[in-house]
């Protein structure tokens, strides 16, 4: 019922973790692999291992979360070794998603060259929604720099590649970014990363709740679902059909998943809710989505995918 075709591969369902959640270590990744998730993605890696920002840097909130993690990860080679080994031992399984998030364009190019030269046959996600040069916006808010990077990437990269984007809030920005992305043989766009630089306050203590950046951090969870749905829809209606969409942001229930699929997402990533509930969330959310589809008389996701009605 939930069978999904994505990047020319077949998955039992559209659900996966969002990079950053439950995917830091091999143990985490193995738990995801053993769960009901249709697919899973590694922690966004940098060339070298990173400790990330000082604690506390992640706090669950009533309707979501705030974080300023600072890209903690065990380094590119740790994750590449894992995916290559896994690929060899489990050749019959669907492809693994491998996430990278270089601290500069040069670092992204270096990692993509290593992936290109390796035997990795899965899907790579390039995170364009993390810090760039100090004093400049994160890469995907710098349209010129994004276009320049992708031009360079596709001079050598021939494997399936998706990009993870921050949320946009201006219709003109959707137009500009879609025009850039449509130039390239991208496999997918992942919308959205957390909404940057929110602030959550503990009124009792009269203080912020996370330590880095004076308490400013990315907001996730139910708080961001309307923004995520808007971004999914905006890109679904603007991108060439060969570029598929992963919907991320505020997916906690079967209904949230249904709404993302209705807007045009093909795969769905869960972050905040997975952090709160653990991999058992996939069992629950699959049942809830199937129940909604049964109530509506839908046999498959294709029956309603992308078919959001306007008034």
Curated annotation (Swiss-Prot):
The record's free-text note on cofactor binding: Binds 1 FMN per subunit.
Active site: 130
Resulting phenotype, residue 130 to A/S: Almost total loss of activity with oxygen or 2,6-dichloroindophenol as electron acceptor
BP GO terms, sorted: 'de novo' pyrimidine nucleobase biosynthetic process; 'de novo' UMP biosynthetic process
Residues annotated for substrate binding in this entry: 43, 67-71, 127, 193-194
Alphabetical UniProt keywords: Cytoplasm, Flavoprotein, FMN, Oxidoreductase, Pyrimidine biosynthesis
Residues the record lists as binding FMN: 19, 43-44, 127, 164, 192, 221, 249-250, 271-272
GO molecular function, one term: dihydroorotate dehydrogenase (fumarate) activity
Primary localization: cytoplasm
Subunit structure: Homodimer.
Protein name, UniProt field: Dihydroorotate dehydrogenase A (fumarate)
